Amino acid sequence: MAPNNKKIKGKSNVGKGSKSKKGQQTRKTPTLKQKLHRESKVVKAESLNWKTVEVPDNLDDWEGFYGLEEIDGVDVKIVNGKAEFIVKDNKKVKKGKTEEQEELEDDEEQDEDEESEADEEQGEDEDEDEEHEEDKINEENEDEFEEEEFTGFDDDSEIQDGMEVEDILDEDINEIGEVDESVEPVQESKPEHDEELSENVFQHSQFVLPDDEDINLPHWQNEDSNFSLSPYTLHGLSVLGFDKPTPIQKKTIPLAAEGKDVVGKAITGSGKTLAYGIPILEKYLSNLSIINQNRQKKIINHPTGIIFAPTRELAHQVVSHLNSLAKYSPLSTNGIVSITGGLSIQKQERLLSHGPGIIVATPGRILELLQKDEDLTKRLASTDIIVLDEADRLLQDGHFEEFETILDLFRKNRPKNKTFPWKWQTLVFSATFSRDLFGKLDKNQKSHKRNSEGSSLIGNDEILNLLNDKLKFKDTRPALVDANPKEIVSGNITEALVECGPTERDLYLYYFLLMYKGSTLVFANSIDSVKRLVPFLNNLNIPAFAIHSSMIQKQRLRALERFQKASEKNDTAVLIASDVAARGLDIPNIDHVAHYHLPRSADVYIHRSGRTARAGKEGVSVMFCSPQEASGPLRKLRRLVANNSTKGGRLNMHNDVKLLPIEMDLVSQLKPRVIIASKLADADISNTSTRKEDSWVKQAAEELGVDDLSDLDDFEDDIIKKQRKRKEGKMITKDEKKGLRYELKELLSKSIRKETRRSYLTSGLQNIAHQMVTGVGHEDVVGHSKVNALDDLKGKKVARSKAGKVTKPSQKKQEKKQKKQERKDTMRKQKEGNRK
């Protein structure tokens, strides 16, 4: 390289001979043409690094494509009828031609450009010559730097823990794009480093084994057995702040670690994810030496555990929770992957090709992958553990045929040798395991005798036999764990009822959201209701977001992210959801769950209500119920869900569920707002649906060759006509919409006042002036103190006097009611004893 460099310098010095001392002057920036010359190179076709095109085997003959070659990343320019190939990447050029020769050609072209410009501006040409000289020197230094840099990887190279060189290259390829296979990898220049690197994958691991003295988690050590968690897991639990295991975790983790099949039941929000996640992680760590040996032999490892979830959102949530725990273990970054619908199947195939340790999947997408790849089926069939999260869905007939097909494929393709046990370990978890909870609430079904243990899993042979028929447990009888045998709904959830008419749900929902600040999750039975409630609440200046099954996966995840951000910024944030968000989702800091419609079955109600009061916190579950629902479905729901303390006696619904206190003077002031907001929301939905129908009808008419659309009215069904007329009746013009929006804006600008007849701030029972000064007044209701739904329902509501002092209400009325109830119970028991 040195002789060529001297030639370049000599050439540049010639142009410098007649130059005066201008080195100290400011240099001008290079022209666009000079920049293009430096960035790109013109090469010949035979100098390019062509790739051979692989012709598919299904072609009988080559059809003129024999020896076809291709290349990408090269620009073609036609100059004087000839094609010139312009290259910006040196990898696209064969190594036969030296880089020094290419630089000389570029320098000659740049010198020619400079000579052509010298006649016009000689002074600028001298500056540019000086600039070219320094650029050439810089290019020489860069070439020398590149030669020193790309001599291979040193021993001190930092490799991401738990990953091979191939994994790192795969990630680089995905970030940069498609890489030419004919270009030799850079690290091949020093093969001895590659061999050493592949033999010592975890030699430079950042995961130093934590010191046992630094970890103080005595509650996680099981004194009854010799089982103990690894330091990696204990370190992760310590960092996450999980000092004590929950009851379900304390009972199931030792059993699962012994390799037993486990069926676990616990209330919502009790930590079931870690109850099965920790045993899988411990199993992976115990097999770490075998996993590393397989990596050195270029063998793809089979997964340690496969977790099946009923919904996509739950699968992504499980991955997030397990990653937060496994972050402090040797499990690689791609060691836990989610395989769900709605996302790129090619990316999921690539993730599975790396042999992840834990797979969290929905049955539909993973079945699609298994049917495409037989090798993948054999590898996944070798798994050690299979987990069913929210497994109560399997008890319902007609659900999850895909899951049963997956199990059949695993049984047929599981290796039959001494290396693998003949059957995998099965872990089953859910919050509901009673068949009575799955019946429709609006249908009259035969009354089943309630078990003496209520909803307890222990001794429930019917559920156990049903699970065994579908799952084929490894053990003759799996270990049954019921952390809450007497609880169906979590004791931290306060249930409430709002009695309203069928057409007044919007009004009372708005009242609830306005009065009680916080993040609220509203469930509706239909997707149309979800779509209507979002614009309705947005019109009332309440941030609302929607999630339902008709949305694609990215839209659902984006809606959840926006809701969480809105709940952090604003006092009130609402997520309107269908039952797709009812199971398993752990959305942080949900204060209230509102049932806009009464759920269709009791198990859905349990899982809906379980979205609040998670991880030991308290929450409120409110039902908006019409008189028609109260007479039938609500009574049946309360009979199934009520605490076991009321068994054997007559169910008093008002004692079981508390009525939410409603102030009718405030409701009457909110009604005009709700009417206008509802009209605007209905108009938006009607306009959108009618526009879609019209476009569909026009497209169908064009395909049928019908010119006059009125001819299609004769073939339209009567029901469709009624629906169309109903939608058209809700449509309004643009001027009417503007008028309604202006009217609603005026109403929202006016404050709601308690006891509106008062004219002075200091008059009445509430001292408004004192509330405004101290900041204890309600933000949206003048003359009303701040309220909390949990305190109001638990009887902690306080009365504030004119001076602002707090006084507790008397409890004599409550004590009288309790005494009367006790007398009635004793009289009833005496009568039953006399009859016997």
UniProtKB/Swiss-Prot annotation:
Q: Per the record, where are the segments of Basic and acidic residues compositional bias? A: 822-836
Residues that coordinate or bind ATP? A266, I267, T268, G269, S270, G271, K272, T273
Q: Where is the composition biased (Basic residues)?
A: 1-10, 796-821
Q: What GO CC annotations are associated with the protein?
A: cytosol; nucleolus
Enumerate the catalysed reactions: ATP + H2O = ADP + phosphate + H(+)
Point to the regions of Acidic residues compositional bias.
100-133, 140-160
Question: According to its UniProt record, where is this protein mainly located?
Answer: nucleus
Q: Where is this motif: Q motif?
A: 222-250
Q: If you read the UniProt record, what top EC class would you report for this enzyme, in one word?
A: hydrolase
- Where do the Helicase ATP-binding domain residues begin and end? 253-451
Q: What is its EC number?
A: 3.6.4.13
Compartments where found: Nucleus, Nucleolus
Motif position, DEAD box = 389-392
Determine if ATP-binding is one of this entry's keywords.
yes
Occurrences of domain Helicase C-terminal (ranges): 508-665
Superkingdom to which the source organism belongs: Eukaryota
GO molecular function (one)? ATP hydrolysis activity
Q: Which GO terms describe its biological process?
A: rRNA processing
Q: Can you tell me which family this protein belongs to?
A: Belongs to the DEAD box helicase family. DDX24/MAK5 subfamily.
Question: What is stated about domains?
Answer: The Q motif is unique to and characteristic of the DEAD box family of RNA helicases and controls ATP binding and hydrolysis.
What function is annotated for this protein?
ATP-binding RNA helicase involved in the biogenesis of 60S ribosomal subunits and is required for the normal formation of 25S and 5.8S rRNAs.
Q: Give the protein name, as stated in the record.
A: ATP-dependent RNA helicase MAK5
Q: Which organism is it from?
A: Scheffersomyces stipitis (strain ATCC 58785 / CBS 6054 / NBRC 10063 / NRRL Y-11545)
| Gene label | MAK5
